[in-house]
Amino acid sequence: MTEEKDEYGTIVVARVAMEENMFNPQPDIPRIRNDSTHSYQQPESMLEKLNTYYTLAVVIAQLTIGVLGNSLTLVADATRIFADHLELFQYDRAATPGKRLTEIITVGITNVILFLLFVAFLLTASGRAATMEFDINRLYLSIGTAMAMTANTLQTLCHFRTWQRERSYHSSLYTGSKRNQLMHGFVYHFIAYFVLVSSLLIIVNKDYLIADVITTYATSLLILANISSIGYQLYHEYFSLEHPQDEYEPI
């Protein structure tokens, strides 16, 4: 009888201890994930999704029209539009390290391809400038220029919409301050407009074929600006992946 009471008392004490641990856990356990290094990512709006689809459509159309019309400016500007859109890519910092690394590698490979295209545009434009033995279909050039100007306007609006959000990291480059962001918006896209308008000289008079070479050089420099910005973003994303802060905190 005494043994049964002792056993019953042990069970009661153990149950009370479990309840105390349940409602007053030790500071070491349990531990929950603290996403201090993974900033909240706002979901992509319908406008941004439509802009993405439209941008891809314009890039494909411009590449096709540029090749058919033999306009190096249209081909280079299609690449610039894609590079500028890629610069706005929102990395998912709430994803697993494996998925984040996949994003970084994919964007990095794309950035390398863009750099190779940048070099190809410079070499091709230099070859055209040396011989001037090329012709451009003015009808294709007119259609492609109109599409490019529309896409440039939408990208300007998307840039300003993105800059209103708080970035997941603080950079010291031009993307780091609102002032320099606005400078990028006005200067970059103003130059893009100027390049496209300059290409209209060819439509007026074919004697201005040299404008296709000059605008290709200018567009290539804009592509290089995008490549540099994307590379800087990749550096910060990879650094945050390799050197995370304390991701856990006690309840």
From Swiss-Prot:
UniProt KW keywords: Membrane, Transmembrane, Transmembrane helix
Keyword Transmembrane helix applies: yes
Organism in which the protein naturally occurs: Caenorhabditis elegans
Membrane topology category: Multi-pass membrane protein
Signal peptide: none
The protein's name: Uncharacterized protein F19C6.5
Subcellular locations according to the entry: Membrane
Residue stretches spanning the membrane: 56-76, 104-124, 184-204, 208-228
Cellular component GO terms, alphabetical: membrane
InterPro entries, A to Z: Cation_efflux_TMD_sf (IPR027469)
